[in-house]
Structures are given as C-alpha cells and as structure tokens.
Amino acid sequence: MTRPLILVTNDDGIDSVGLHVLARALTDLGDVMIVAPDQEFSGAGAAIGALHVIQPEVHLAHVEGIDRAWAVTGPPALCVMFARLGAFGRLPDLIVSGINPGANVGRSVYHSGTVGAALTGRNGHIPGIAVSQSVDDFGVEGQGYDEMLANQCWSSAATVATSAAQALLADPPPDSGVLNINVPNLPIEDMGGWRWTEVGTAPPRSMAKAELEPKLGHEGSYKVRLTWGDEQTPPSATDTGTVMEGYVSLTWLSRITALDLDTPAVETAISRLMQPAPSLTP
C-alpha cells in the first residue's frame, strides 16, 4: 500500500529548527518531503513573486532524518505551487506548514507566509495544516525574534500538528480547507485543552505607529521606526484569546469570498463610466 505523501514547508527558511522538528515528527504518518524557501520569508502571505524577474531556482538540501528536501529561491507559496504542479514528482496528499515561531492569529493570518503556503495548496484541492506557536515575552504580528526562541517547546506544537495530520489523512475533509493551528508555548500537560475558534481582529500585540527617521549620510532616505502597542486582552472565542489563555486554537480557513454589500454610489459611478459615449453625428 502506498504511503501518503506529506509536503512540509514554512516561511522561516530551510534551516529553521521548527521546520525540522515538524518534518521528523510526521515521518511515522507517511513519506515526508520538505520544499521550503532558501531564506527567511516571514510575512510573505500567499505571494509567489514576479517569476519573470526572480527566475526562481530549486536546490537539493539536507535535513537530518528526511529523505527528500528542496530549497527554493522564492516564498513559501511558490514552494507549494511548484509541488502541486508536479515539479517534484508525485503530488502531495497533505501540506503541513510550520512550525512558525509566533502565533498566526487575528490579522496576522492575512500576511502569514505559514498560512499562505497552506492556502496555496488548498487552491489546488490539497488539504493543509498551518501550525504556529506563541513565543515567550511577545511576538508581534505573528513573528518571533531569535532571542525569544531559547525556550521554545517545539515538540508540543509538533505533537499537536502530527495528531491533526493523522486524523486528516484518515478522514479527509469534504472540502480542501486549511486547519490553522496555534499552540501555546507550553508542555502538552500544562495546556488547558483546545477550542474551535474564530479569527480575531488583532494579534496579542500589534504594530501601533510608524515614523520616518532620516538615514545619516543618505539624503532623501529614511529608516522606519516602529512602535509596538500594548498587549491586548481579546475575547476567549477568538484564536488570539484562546492561545493567550493557554489553549490550542483550531480554525478552519478557506478561499477568499465575496461580500454582498449594498453600495449604490459605487454602482452609479461605474454605470456612468460604462455608458456609451454620446454620438457626435446629427
């Protein structure tokens, strides 16, 4: 019997510890192939880049315990797109993206490369999991800085993701959605449990202000200084609140959908624009 093929990717790059821990944890469930960016691409969302400009390349990589690993000179969504178009042979049965250091909750979901990679697979009718983990101190907009990661409980997030992956492989969802998993940075036994959640309106701590500072010796050039806002206390029903309270957050994500809004001013403006020009002949 053919073992399922699990594609593992991330937005932190091929050398990320979280990627390696996750990939090795999934090897009991099927054949694991890593296809990940060759460098840091946090915040890339579902971008694939201007392919005619970047002319991406693919290189063999070595990850201990994994038979097949590829590094792509492009963002994570491009890694997944290449895979689902057959660049690496057999198409994956499941895409697992992570482990991202820093919870991808609230509006961080929109620009998360971790989530964007899984959604790109979903566009090709391949179910996916995006797994992220909160960090000590604070992570801003879904990103954790290196100095915060010394005490990261990678194995906890990998265990949760592996359990979910096993269930999805055994009983695939009727629609190829993406399960966005956010795990507190705690040992499994210290977590409060898990909840189905809605996407919140903000991460635990947001970027609050951006100011331009002149770059010394470079007239007309500026550095951008960012100020962080205060930590928020979001509702428990949201992904943000759930993780902050020590629970695992599970949220199903799907395609971008249209809103049905009543906007007569827009309709009138576009209708006027599209009317035939008046005839100039008598």
Give the ranges of each region predicted by the language model:
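Glycine/threonine-rich flexible loop motifs
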Residues: 103-112
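C-terminal accessory domains and tails appended to enzymatic cores
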Residues: 150-152, 169-282
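Short, glycine-rich nucleotide/cofactor-binding loops
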Residues: 8-15, 108-109
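A cross-family phosphate/adenosyl-ligand binding-site feature
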Residues: 2-6, 17-86, 90-91
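Alpha-helix C-terminal capping segments
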Residues: 83-89, 116-127
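Active-site glycine-rich loop that binds ribose-phosphate moieties when present
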Residues: 112-118, 142-168
